[in-house]
């Protein structure tokens, strides 16, 4: 079974192509035109050990929101395509990741049902990282959840500095996804018989 996907998303605001391979960790350096988003996508690929290629352009002269959100949407679509009927996947993943003073916890369920609980939006996270805030990250994750059929809970246990908060969350997501997409049986991981 091949767990590959290529998704192209073009709007008046962005043009994004994502290639995803759930079983081969070969990836290309992301090229979105937004340095910090590239850094986070690189971290996502490396720590999830998934093959990921992201080529994108967008209306960065306005603000990075559209590009970041649409990258999440496109990644969610690629994840849905690559997972197929989700037969045999572990389904759940959870990871804690520290980054200096920051500690993030991310839990995912690849149930096919979309939900994002994003605790950092209720906290006082300071500043931005390369023009990206934790609110931008929330929109990326919301797009991923809505279009990838992912239930995700994001908790921030310590830390307030935006760069460390965003990076710890992305790395925790990567490690949780790595576990959740793993093939561990030939059954659908559901008492309903479908996901």
Swiss-Prot record:
Reaction(s) catalysed by this chain's protein: D-erythro-1-(imidazol-4-yl)glycerol 3-phosphate = 3-(imidazol-4-yl)-2-oxopropyl phosphate + H2O
Keyword Ribosomal protein included in the entry's annotation: no
Enzyme class: lyase
Cellular component terms (Gene Ontology): cytoplasm
Pathway(s) this gene product operates in, as recorded in its UniProt entry: Amino-acid biosynthesis; L-histidine biosynthesis; L-histidine from 5-phospho-alpha-D-ribose 1-diphosphate: step 6/9
Homology family: Belongs to the imidazoleglycerol-phosphate dehydratase family.
Protein name: Imidazoleglycerol-phosphate dehydratase
Taxonomic source organism: Deinococcus deserti (strain DSM 17065 / CIP 109153 / LMG 22923 / VCD115)
């Amino acid at each position: 079974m091949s767990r590959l996907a290529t998704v192209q998303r073009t709007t008046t605001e962005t043009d994004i192509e994502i290639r995803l391979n759930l079983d081969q960790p070969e990836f290309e350096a992301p090229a979105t035109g937004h340095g910090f988003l590239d850094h986070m996508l690189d971290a996502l690929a490396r720590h999830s050990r998934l093959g990921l290629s992201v080529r994108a352009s967008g209306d960065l002269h306005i603000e990075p929101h559209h590009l970041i959100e649409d990258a999440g949407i496109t990644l969610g679509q690629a994840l849905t395509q690559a997972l197929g009927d989700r037969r045999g996947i572990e389904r759940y993943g959870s990871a804690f990741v520290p980054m200096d003073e920051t500690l993030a916890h991310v839990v995912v369920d690849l149930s096919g049902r979309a939900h994002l609980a994003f605790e950092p939006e209720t906290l006082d996270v300071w500043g931005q990282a390369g023009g990206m805030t934790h609110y931008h990250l929330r929109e990326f994750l919301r797009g991923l959840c809505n279009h990838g059929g992912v239930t995700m809970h994001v908790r921030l246990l310590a830390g307030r500095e935006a760069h460390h908060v965003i990076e710890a969350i992305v790395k925790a997501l990567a490690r949780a996804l790595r576990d959740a997409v793993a093939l561990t049986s030939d059954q659908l991981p559901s008492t309903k018989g479908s996901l």
